[in-house]
């Protein structure tokens, strides 16, 4: 469950290390985001020669949450931390590699690129 001010790891090779959620997109009163939701983020920590720099604002899709994802069969998929992948204005991933596992919930028409780049899909 991601809300405003939540800090997330970045699971791609854009050069960003940590980002902070500044808005959950999808309705004016929407409070929480979970896996597969798009959020607006600000870069808080970035590598020196990366594609992005500190203070930049991007869209991102949540790929892992510590809260977890409940499946229809009753199972729960949890992770050690929260992670996101940075997106451009066309909602395509900026990075060319994804680090760590992603969940099957991302397998929509929108995020198939992220699923195909991920080393493991749970």
From Swiss-Prot:
<keyword id="KW-0699">rRNA-binding</keyword>
<dbReference type="GO" id="GO:0003735">
    <property type="term" value="F:structural constituent of ribosome"/>
</dbReference>
<protein>
    <recommendedName>
        <fullName>Large ribosomal subunit protein uL14</fullName>
    </recommendedName>
</protein>
<keyword id="KW-0687">Ribonucleoprotein</keyword>
<keyword id="KW-0689">Ribosomal protein</keyword>
<comment type="similarity">
    <text>Belongs to the universal ribosomal protein uL14 family.</text>
</comment>
<comment type="function">
    <text>Binds to 23S rRNA. Forms part of two intersubunit bridges in the 70S ribosome.</text>
</comment>
<dbReference type="GO" id="GO:0070180">
    <property type="term" value="F:large ribosomal subunit rRNA binding"/>
</dbReference>
<dbReference type="InterPro" id="IPR005745">
    <property type="entry name" value="Ribosomal_uL14_bac-type"/>
</dbReference>
<comment type="subunit">
    <text>Part of the 50S ribosomal subunit. Forms a cluster with proteins L3 and L19. In the 70S ribosome, L14 and L19 interact and together make contacts with the 16S rRNA in bridges B5 and B8.</text>
</comment>
<dbReference type="Pfam" id="PF00238">
    <property type="entry name" value="Ribosomal_L14"/>
</dbReference>
<dbReference type="InterPro" id="IPR019972">
    <property type="entry name" value="Ribosomal_uL14_CS"/>
</dbReference>
<keyword id="KW-0694">RNA-binding</keyword>
<dbReference type="GO" id="GO:0022625">
    <property type="term" value="C:cytosolic large ribosomal subunit"/>
</dbReference>
<dbReference type="InterPro" id="IPR000218">
    <property type="entry name" value="Ribosomal_uL14"/>
</dbReference>
<dbReference type="InterPro" id="IPR036853">
    <property type="entry name" value="Ribosomal_uL14_sf"/>
</dbReference>
<dbReference type="GO" id="GO:0006412">
    <property type="term" value="P:translation"/>
</dbReference>
């Amino acid at each position: 469950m991601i809300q405003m001010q939540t800090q997330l790891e970045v699971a791609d090779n854009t050069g960003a290390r940590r980002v902070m959620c500044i808005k959950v997109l999808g309705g004016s009163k929407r409070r929480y985001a979970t896996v597969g939701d798009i959020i607006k983020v600000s870069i808080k920590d970035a590598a020196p020669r990366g594609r992005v720099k500190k203070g930049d604002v991007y869209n991102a899709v949540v790929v892992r949450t510590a809260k977890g994802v409940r499946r229809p069969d009753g199972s729960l998929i949890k992770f050690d931390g929260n992670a996101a992948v940075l997106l451009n204005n066309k909602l395509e991933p900026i990075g060319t590699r994804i680090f760590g596992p992603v969940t099957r919930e991302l397998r929509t028409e929108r995020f198939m690129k992220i699923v195909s780049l991920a080393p493991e899909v749970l």
